[in-house]
Amino acid sequence: MRIGLYPGTFDPVTNGHLDIIGRAVKLVDKLVIGVAVNIGKGPLFTLEERVATLERETAHLTKIAQIEVRPFDTLLMYFAREVGAQMIVRGLRAVADFEYEFQMTAMNQQLDREIETVFLMADPRHQAIASRLVKEIAALGGDVHKFVPPGVAEQLLAKLAK
């Protein structure tokens, strides 16, 4: 069984994330979506909310491949081994992403040479989307419906209204 791992903070999940997930499921028999605890980023949504949102937003893709959404709070390569992943899937939006991902991949290869990293280029419609910017736009009263699924937009607006 080919198992892929798509890790991220997903705070919130964006249309860009979902595009990568939708393409990644076609490459594997099972895709594990690893939701990083990542306390350092100070997430707006709780870990439980992010996991539940991803489960809801990816439910329709289970016809293509098995999907499992799991939180993790360890080194990525340790988590990849734990779930039996042969590949890590990463999305690239711009040159800055490539530089960061190149360095991370080089370090990850030192930890486990058996796990490959596969890069998927972001769809041009989603190249500018970043969770950080979506939160900023929403906080300043902007419309985020073109950047995130409708349910996520509503969650985001409700969270910021508190």
UniProtKB/Swiss-Prot annotation:
Its EC number is 2.7.7.3. It is found in: Cytoplasm. The record marks H17 as: Transition state stabilizer. GO terms for biological process: coenzyme A biosynthetic process. InterPro entries: Cyt_trans-like, PPAT, Rossmann-like_a/b/a_fold. Pathway: Cofactor biosynthesis; coenzyme A biosynthesis; CoA from (R)-pantothenate: step 4/5. Substrate binds at T9, K41, L76, R90. One of its GO terms (cellular component) is cytoplasm. It catalyses: (R)-4'-phosphopantetheine + ATP + H(+) = 3'-dephospho-CoA + diphosphate. Keywords: ATP-binding, Coenzyme A biosynthesis, Cytoplasm, Magnesium, Nucleotide-binding, Nucleotidyltransferase, Transferase. Its main location: cytoplasm. Reversibly transfers an adenylyl group from ATP to 4'-phosphopantetheine, yielding dephospho-CoA (dPCoA) and pyrophosphate. Homohexamer. This is Phosphopantetheine adenylyltransferase.
